[in-house]
């Protein structure tokens, strides 16, 4: 729904997202707000956590979660407006690569990608 509020986004946490996919048994998900990343040269992602000097890609027990520090990686951006894109084939290659990277990292098919606040801004893959 369009509320008039600014659309805000932060780096995706692949560790927590993968855990959520596993716990919920998800097999097909939507990646939303991809258009907000449109003019970033690099897109940050939390690819792992550092806990007590150890790097892990597994979601930690709640008792140690507070000690987890994000380990960031950076993906190439696409530096163009994608809000008018309506097909997967018309998406810039770097945007498709980002979606496929997230899909592989979380172990779940991304069947829908939103590229704007409008109802028509949903791409079915």
Regions found by a protein language model. Give the residues of each.
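Non-transmembrane, aqueous-exposed alpha-helical and coiled segments at domain scale
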Residues: 1-125
